[in-house]
Design a protein with these regions (language model features):
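Short beta-to-alpha linker loops that shape the active-site pocket of alpha/beta-hydrolase fold enzymes
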Residues: 62, 85, 90-94, 160
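Glycine-rich nucleophile elbow surrounding the catalytic serine of serine-hydrolase chemistry
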Residues: 130-140
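Alpha/beta-hydrolase fold nucleophile elbow
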Residues: 119-132
Length: 168
């Protein structure tokens, strides 16, 4: 895309993606990180320096370090650097490396609880993201009427496709 002066300009979607990748690569930590209790779990909140454009709720995959995994923290900061408020909760059973048929409901209940708390989700729309094992649960929760109208974007990285096989 070219501007009237002949300079090349990236569409805003590409600018956002570029900014995210650059922030991730540089391991930038703009804004503020706070950990708060929420129900029976902990939630990391990454607040950008300016008014957030949207709120991301990111559910970690099956990993013992959960929200404290350095890769997850780095992604939280990178998303924050693009002007997003980021919430990263621990899902107790997933962090404990347990697999059960109760997890889809556990994740959905947690997401609805977070999204319904206006002190945590300060924007009208939300972005739901997840990686690996938790992605199928986040996808299922996004279809719930309590969340569907507010979900603007889904970002699922390396998720499983068969919830029945995952939960067996």
């Amino acid at each position: 895309m070219r501007t009237p002066q002949g300079q090349q300009r990236l569409p805003s979607d590409w600018q956002g993606a570029f900014k995210l990748l650059l922030a991730y690569q540089r391991n930038q930590t703009p804004g503020k990180l706070e950990t708060i209790p929420h129900g029976d779990t902990q939630v990391d909140i990454y607040d950008p320096l300016s008014e957030p454009r949207s709120t991301v709720i990111f559910v970690p995959g099956l990993a013992i370090r959960g929200r404290e995994d350095p890769r997850i923290r780095r992604l939280g900061w990178a998303l924050c650097a693009t002007g997003l408020r980021v919430l990263i909760p621990d899902v107790p059973s997933i962090r404990a490396l347990t697999i059960s048929t109760r997890q889809p409901d556990e994740v959905a209940t947690l997401l609805k609880s977070l999204a319904g708390d206006r002190t945590l989700v300060t924007t009208d729309d939300i972005v739901l993201m997840s990686v690996s094992f938790s992605s199928i649960f986040v996808l299922r929760a996004a279809l719930d009427k309590a969340l569907a109208d507010r979900v603007n974007t889904l970002g699922l990285i390396g998720g499983y496709f068969d919830i029945e096989k995952v939960a067996d």
